[in-house]
Amino acid sequence: MAKDNSEKLQVQGEEKKSKQPVNFLPQGKWLKPNEIEYEFGGTTGVIGMLIGFPLLMYYMWICAEFYHGKVALPKAGESWMHFIKHLYQLVLENGIPEKYDWTIFLTFWVFQIIFYYTLPGIWTKGQPLSHLKGKQLPYFCNAMWTLYVTTTLVLVLHFTNLFRLYVIIDRFGRIMTCAIISGFAFSIILYLWTLFISHDYHRMTGNHLYDFFMGAPLNPRWGILDLKMFFEVRLPWFTLYFITLGACLKQWETYGYVTPQLGVVMLAHWLYANACAKGEELIVPTWDMAYEKFGFMLIFWNIAGVPYTYCHCTLYLYYHDPSEYHWSTLYNVSLYVVLLCAYYFFDTANAQKNAFRKQMSGDKTGRKTFPFLPYQILKNPKYMVTSNGSYLLIDGWYTLARKIHYTADWTQSLVWALSCGFNSVFPWFFPVFFLVVLIHRAFRDQAKCKRKYGKDWDEYCKHCPYVFIPYVF
């Protein structure tokens, strides 16, 4: 450990970072009994989510499309059993996929895979992996090209009437079922493949339900295609983006204009999809890629959960006449201003953190993708050198709050919901759910960093004392 604070404040490039990973967390194929720490309520919580996730998705969709965005409840004098049968009948009539729905769903997957293998991109390396004796896996990143080639192709198909994009909303229940089935099927196949064929499993508890949920493999691949990275960017956020783009095209076709409310949601979803695409190589060195296993939780949520629950602001604006959400000009302008300000902090904070990681690893390559915003890269950033050889950034936006990118991220989600007003609870699902997720992740990260850095983390917190909101939280 450095003797005093002045020795911990270093200028970039003064020291060489060790390429050997630090084993501060359990490693190996099987966890020892004293290493097992169940998250999400253990087996009971996992069973609840395996059943609850799809049921919640169906219920939210039914309320959005068939109950005018209201919470569906039994009518006066209607029994709960009759009510549940009615909901089930709606799923049978409107949520069972036909061949056309599977064609739409799988064609998108196929083209995303083809584009991954064929479009230009850049190569980068992940973190040193303990189970591979410090080896860094190569990652090919071309999501930026993929996003805009896919957008061009989709618009050509739409305007030539070969495929009207808003069909994915008109057949929402059926296509969502395709995603739910695929999420379960892919998770089961990958888990069994890992256990019995590849044997590339890690940190298993021996509780198959829990291990299935959390995942068995760490970095499953099809050649150069890393499944975890592929699922994290292209399937969820591109799908959400195209759902909203379809809604905009429908409004333009129906009314001759796109409402300011749907416009701000479209801007938000494009900004987010674009941010994930342009920063794909910056996802590579994150905790999720280096240590999070790839199981049902990540697979299902990326295939089905994210695109088909986070889109309820879009569904509300699509299913309702614009007269039902006619806000004042000041309110509408405020939504755009708050969104763009939040995005600026979200983009630049993440860029500062990830550029610092690249600098410390000796990677001096730069990539200026649109939009390249001021203050994305810190020159000669201040940082701490910990006793285990790691570097902690104590400069830029992170001196204001350690999770300032979470705050900015959540603020964007708040704008999504505010665009719809308060007549339906379902557009508010994402910001409420996301707030819980971010708080859980923040405290999980706090505990992880405390274990990893020890007293160095206490020193770091003196430099960056706030978590979410400067001088408040």
From Swiss-Prot:
It is a multi-pass membrane protein. Gene3D superfamilies: 1.20.120.1630. The chain crosses the membrane at residues 40-64, 102-123, 139-157, 175-197, 233-249, 327-346, 415-439. PROSITE patterns: STEROL_REDUCT_1, STEROL_REDUCT_2. NADP(+) binds at residues 353, 357, 393, 405-406, 445, 449-453, 460. Keywords: Endoplasmic reticulum, Lipid biosynthesis, Lipid metabolism, Membrane, NADP, Oxidoreductase, Steroid biosynthesis, Steroid metabolism, Sterol biosynthesis, Sterol metabolism, Transmembrane, Transmembrane helix. GO terms for molecular function: Delta24(24-1) sterol reductase activity; Delta24-sterol reductase activity. Residues 1-18 have a biased composition (Basic and acidic residues). Residues 1-20 are annotated as: Disordered. Its EC number is 1.3.1.71. GO terms for cellular component: endoplasmic reticulum; endoplasmic reticulum membrane. Residues 65-101, 158-174, 250-326, 440-473 are cytoplasmic. It comes from the Eukaryota. Disruption phenotype: Abolishes the production of ergosterol. Leads to pleiotropic defects such as hypersensitivity to divalent cations and a number of drugs such as cycloheximide, miconazole, 4-nitroquinoline, fluconazole, and sodium dodecyl sulfate. Also leads to sensitivity to the Golgi-destabilizing drug brefeldin A. It is found in: Endoplasmic reticulum membrane. One of its GO terms (biological process) is ergosterol biosynthetic process. Its main location: endoplasmic reticulum. Residues 1-39, 124-138, 198-232, 347-414 are lumenal. It catalyses: ergosterol + NADP(+) = ergosta-5,7,22,24(28)-tetraen-3beta-ol + NADPH + H(+). Pathway: Steroid metabolism; ergosterol biosynthesis; ergosterol from zymosterol: step 5/5. Belongs to the ERG4/ERG24 family. ERG4 Catalyzes the last step of ergosterol biosynthesis by converting ergosta-5,7,22,24(28)-tetraen-3beta-ol into ergosterol. The third module or late pathway involves the ergosterol synthesis itself through consecutive reactions that mainly occur in the endoplasmic reticulum (ER) membrane. Firstly, the squalene synthase ERG9 catalyzes the condensation of 2 farnesyl pyrophosphate moieties to form squalene, which is the precursor of all steroids. Present with 1640 molecules/cell in log phase SD medium. This is Delta(24(24(1)))-sterol reductase ERG4. It comes from Saccharomyces cerevisiae (strain ATCC 204508 / S288c).
